[in-house]
């Protein structure tokens, strides 16, 4: 967290601040993690939501599952893949970009979500996520319900979910 904040803060005064991209942040994070020589790495997705221009930019560093965009009654994974940050000196992170629809939700999960899904295998659990978000109509509370977490007394300790939405009914 501190590494990314430091990088962003150091570029806010520069003319390049407007050029700051998710891939640039991941590249910096990768370099810094490698410089520690600790054999530590992270998987993550770096996103910039530009509400003024209705644009979403993102870059992936080995995170699974991919974010899911729900709009017009349909959910689909966002594109993009990349290596975890902190493992490879020459890791390449790519920027992806798309216009944001007027009505949408964007769901992000930690890999702990797979522990609460009924499917037996990772690939089938991952494939079921867009269907789950479609059933939930992109709504956070409905997704929690669909995952069986609404009244869960034995909550897995490694599950996180974030839903960003705009004009969702």
Feature map (PLM): residue ranges:
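Catalytic core of PPM/PP2C metal-dependent serine/threonine phosphatase domains
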Residues: 1-79, 93, 149-153, 157, ...
């Amino acid at each position: 967290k501190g590494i990314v904040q430091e990088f962003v803060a150091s570029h806010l005064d520069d003319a390049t601040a407007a050029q700051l991209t998710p891939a640039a942040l991941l590249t910096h994070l990768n370099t810094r993690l490698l410089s520690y020589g600790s054999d530590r790495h992270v998987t993550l997705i770096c996103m910039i939501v530009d509400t003024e221009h209705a644009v979403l930019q993102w870059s992936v560093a080995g995170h699974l599952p991919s974010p899911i965009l729900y709009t017009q009654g349909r959910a689909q994974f966002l594109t993009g893949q990349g290596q975890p940050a902190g493992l490879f000196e020459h890791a390449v992170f790519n920027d992806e970009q798309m216009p944001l629809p007027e009505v949408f939700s964007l769901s992000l999960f930690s890999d702990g979500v797979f522990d609460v899904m009924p499917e037996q295998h990772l690939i089938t659990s991952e494939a079921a996520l867009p269907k789950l978000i479609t059933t939930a109509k992109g709504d956070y509370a409905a997704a929690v319900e669909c995952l069986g977490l609404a009244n869960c007394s034995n909550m897995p300790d490694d599950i996180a979910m974030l839903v960003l939405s705009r004009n969702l009914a």
